[in-house]
């Protein structure tokens, strides 16, 4: 076997099709784009256009609405809190709240508040103040000897108490 005997497998390297090179090539004149019109021009794809057929976004009914008063809570799991405690970024002895979680780097921001979820294992005894918590998270914190205080979300000045 010589170096000159080495060759690619058949069809391994397919030549690209050169378009617009005469009618004999099979891809001349319109270069496979059909006749004239918007789609024969470059850079055109009409999003959601289905060739005149009623498009999907108009075939389906409208549904739901956006609640402008909905509160957006940031979720944090127990394993993330335990990681921060192990890394000495959170003090298990003091009260853990949204502010201390952001300060420690466990959360990026607190939005409208923090919701505690129960993934992972919590070894440290903690006292935590959050705006919501899952049943499994509350059970895990209490099993470790800690407490969970559920806070009421702060109301805007315009809202009735």
Curated annotation (Swiss-Prot):
GO cellular component: cytosolic large ribosomal subunit
GO terms, molecular function: rRNA binding; structural constituent of ribosome
Keyword rRNA-binding annotated: yes
Keyword Phosphoprotein recorded: no
Feature: compositional bias, Gly residues: 21-37
Disulfide cross-links: none
Record field: transmembrane: none
GO BP terms: translation
Start and end residues of each stretch annotated as Disordered: 1-43
Keywords: Ribonucleoprotein, Ribosomal protein, RNA-binding, rRNA-binding
InterPro entries, per the entry: Ribosomal_uL15, Ribosomal_uL15/eL18, Ribosomal_uL15/eL18_sf, Ribosomal_uL15_bac-type, Ribosomal_uL15_CS
Pfam families found in the cross-reference section: Ribosomal_L27A
Function: Binds to the 23S rRNA.
Membership in a protein family: Belongs to the universal ribosomal protein uL15 family.
Subunit architecture: Part of the 50S ribosomal subunit.
PANTHER family linked to this entry: 50S RIBOSOMAL PROTEIN L15, LARGE RIBOSOMAL SUBUNIT PROTEIN UL15M
Name under which the protein is recorded: Large ribosomal subunit protein uL15
Gene name linked to the record: rplO
């Amino acid at each position: 076997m010589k170096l000159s005997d080495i060759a690619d497998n058949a069809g391994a390297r397919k030549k690209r099709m050169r378009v617009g090179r005469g009618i004999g090539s099979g891809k001349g004149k319109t270069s496979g784009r059909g006749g004239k019109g918007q789609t024969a021009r470059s850079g055109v794809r009409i999003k959601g256009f289905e060739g005149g057929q009623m498009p999907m976004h108009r075939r389906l009914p409208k549904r739901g609405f956006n609640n402008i008063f909905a509160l957006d809570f940031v979720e944090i799991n127990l394993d993330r809190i335990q990681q921060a405690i192990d890394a000495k970024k959170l003090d298990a002895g003091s009260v853990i709240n949204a502010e201390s979680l952001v300060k420690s780097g466990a959360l990026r921001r607190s939005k409208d508040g923090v919701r505690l979820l129960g993934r992972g294992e919590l070894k440290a005894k903690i006292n935590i103040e959050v705006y919501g918590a899952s049943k499994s998270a509350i059970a895990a914190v209490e099993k470790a000897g800690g407490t969970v205080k559920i806070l009421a979300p702060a109301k805007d000045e315009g809202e009735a108490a």
